Structures are given as structure tokens and as C-alpha cells.
Amino acid sequence: MPRLTPLPRDAFDFAAARHLLVRAGFGGTPGMVQGLLSRGLDGAVDWLVDFEGESASGPDRNIQADTFDPRVKMQLTAADYESYRKAREAGDEEAIAAFRRKQEQQERDDRGAMRSFEQWWLSRMIETPRPLEEKLTLFWHGHFAASYTTVENSWHMFRQNQFFRKHAAGNFGDLLHGIIEDPAMLRFLDNNRNRKGSPNENLAREIMELFSLGEPELLGRKRSPYREPDIKEGARALTGYTYRDNAFFFDEGQHDNGLKRILGRSGRWNGHDFVDMLLGHRSCSEFIAWKIYRAFVNDVPETPPSDEVRNVVVQLGKVLKGNKYNLKKTLGELFRSAHFYAASNRAAHIKSPVELVVGSVRDLGVPVRNIDTLRTAAARLGQRLCHPPSVKGWDGGRAWINTSTMFLRQNTAVWMLTGRDAGGHPWPKDTTPFDPMPLVEQLERQGEVDPDEATVYLQRLLLACPVEEARSQAIRQVFTLANDRVNADSLTAALCVLTALPEYQLC
């Protein structure tokens, strides 16, 4: 079985434990990092990847019964359309207006349900005792990207989210097979219009290009592993894959059962045969390894990547393929590897907006204050949950940062720390008290905290890399202005300075 070179066990220190908790989750308080460190490398990795052992508490309780109703956005029935047609033929303006009012109210209700779902998911990421489960759910949402803007059905988006969560660290094959039966994806890529004799190529194209085999230039390949005829034949294999009444439906009458030639193999292939062929191609495991690498190890702005990175990705792909696409085993191998903890891979990932707001709550221990404000902040920063900009998902990396988003990131952190709006945004003032002193409680000596120690410790705790001396002194200056006292007010002010640093945007 292929292996990545493991990290020496004695090299798993506080900084390594923090790196693991941030990358495989959304970070945490000093106590959480110390708890992970106390488990040792193997125990820490096992705890993260074997998350089923932790109870799913928090906002997950009764979510289906209390928050979402599949009837909010039911598809209009044939009877509804027939009634509408008759009303139009008869010129019954009252019936037509009633039909439209019902439709508009249904759409408003569904948009409200979608907002509730976004709030729920953000809350779950903040509160979850299973950080890797939610990190992977977010990862698969970006990989198999579908947007509510097109789907226009909150229940379908919710069910897709639950599907990603169910298989988060399971088997990639189950994810790929399941996505061709997912109503949200079928609607998003128009496969509900993919019929015998009139194939729609959208799903077939994206399942090859974005979901399984990838584009050739990503890993420096000389040629694509598939060609246009493969896409066309794959589309035929997916004919009849649609949905009815909020569930997948295989319309046998609209399925093309003729002979098809895909990736050099001929047969009367259906959609799942098509998926099996993709999973069997060597490019698939490498491409998924590449996506995992970019999400969990290093953003890698250069394309194609360096020889070193490519070698690690190829090896990780072999681990994935050797484990028959078992994600838990593959991630465990990655999180134990020396490469994952290498200095070149620390502070090598720009926090996404969701990672920023969720991670700040978990790292700093600030109150949530207003979950919809956090949702709105992430959206303004470029990442609204369930609204990726395209089927490619979010570009990530350096695309997250520009002059305006950097300013908004800084102001978001100030609001989270103080409840006050520093940037002129219509965010609600929040007076929920925040006591930052637990962050430095282990530095306390005879009831006081040394400001020099606090300055160094905060950087060690919250930053993934050292900062210039001038920036460190800017943090220290806050305590100087407070007569060298480290208390709730001065510590909060110091955190406002620290979270405004460019280095805070990295993990």
C-alpha cells in the first residue's frame, strides 16, 4: 500500500496541533488545541477523522422537523398547470391572479427557508463537536457546486447538504454515484431535460471535467483523459435521470438504452456504469487528491504545480486509489504526513470568508452575537453558502483578497470582538459581553499577566507565521497605552489590532 512519509511523533507540538485543528476543522481555543496535543499525533488524527464517535449536538437537533418543510417549494403538478391553462383560456383573471399570488408566496417562503438553512449551517460549523465533518461538508459543497439561484428549492439544497455530510469522510465513489441522483444537481445542470433523442450534455461534461477527471493543465498533463465524444456518450448514459416530488426518479422511457462508447469501452451503459468508468480511470484519484491537497495542505497558486507538490499529489492519489476511494483512510494518511506539517505549508492557505468568521468565533471564543450578520458578512466577502458563483465553485486562494475585502475582513473582526460596527455597514450593535481573559489565563501570575508575554503568546496562538517586528510592536503598544495592564479592555483592543494583520488571514 502506498504511504506518505509520516511526521515523527515527537514533532507533534502545540503549533502542529493548532495547524491540524485549523486545517482539518475551523480552529479552536487554547484549551481545544491543548486537548488535541494531549492525544498525540495518532490519537489526534483518529479523533478528527473518526468523528462518528462524537455526538452530533448543537443546532442539528430536530432540524428536519422544526426548520424545514419539503412542502414549502413543491413542484407544480399537472393539475395545477391544467387549472392555470383553463383559467387563461377562459380569461378568468381572478383565478389567474390567485394562482400567481400562491406561486409568489411560495417563492417568498422558500427564500426565507433558504436563509434559515444558511444560518443553521453556519451555526453548526461554529458549534459542532465534529469539526472535520463540517469542513468536509463545506469542501464537497465547493467541489460539487450547485447554487440556490438556479435550483430555487431550499429543500433540495438542504437534502444535498445532508448527503454531503453523510458521506463526508466515507467513499468518494458513493459521492460520485449519489450526485447523479441528487435533485439539486440534476436541476442545476439541467439533467431533468436530458432525454432520449435530445441529450443535454451539462451534467456529463461537468462530472468529467470538474467532479472526477479534471482539466489536463491542473497537474501538468499533456493531454486530456477524455474527449468530446466521451462527453456526448456520457450524456446519453445519463438520459432519464431526473426527479419527481422532491426525490430522484429514473424515467426509463426517456433513457437511451442504445450502444455507447465511453473512454474506449462499448456497451449499453447507464449513468452508474458511466460513473464506474470514471472511478476506474487513473486520472480520477489523482484529480481528487489534487483537490484535497489544495483545500487542506496548500492553495498552490502555480499551475502546473512544482515537481515536489506533484509528487506528493500523485502519491496521495495512489493512497486514495489503493484504499478504494476511502476518504477517511486517505485523510488520516495525509494528516499524519510530514509534508502536511512542513514549514512551506504553514500560513499557506488564505482563509475563505466562512473559515474566517467561523474560525474567529472558535479561536477567540467571542459570542456569536447575530448569526445572520455573520452570514451576511461572509456573503459580502465573497462566499454565500449555497450560492457558489458557478459550477466550478469558488476560486479560493488569492481570489479571496483585494483592497475592499481586506478592509471588510478587518471590520468584521472588530464587530465580532466588540459588537460595534467599525466600517459603516448596517450591522446591529450588540452588547453581549466578551471576556477575552481566558485566552491568556495560563500566563497569569499573582493575578496579573505580563504584557510582553501576552504579546508573544497571542501571536503564537492566533497566527500561523511570525510577523514583522513593527507589527508585533503595534500589538504591544496597545498594552503600553493601558499602563502595561492586560485586562479585558486592553486585550480586546490588542485582538482588534492582531486580527487586522494580513497574517491573520492565513492559516
Report the location of each language-model feature.
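Flexible, low-complexity segments enriched for small/polar residues
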Residues: 2-13, 18-30, 51, 71, ...
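Active-site substrate-binding loop specific to GH73 endo-beta-N-acetylglucosaminidase modules
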Residues: 2-3, 85-91, 95-103, 114-121, ...
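Aromatic-acidic/polar surface patches that form glycan- and anion
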Residues: 10, 111, 129, 224, ...
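Short, compositionally biased low-complexity segments
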Residues: 15-23, 109-111, 199-202, 206, ...
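N-terminal accessory alpha/beta regions
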Residues: 28-143, 147-167
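Hydrophobic residues in alpha-helical segments
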Residues: 36-37, 48-49, 88, 126, ...
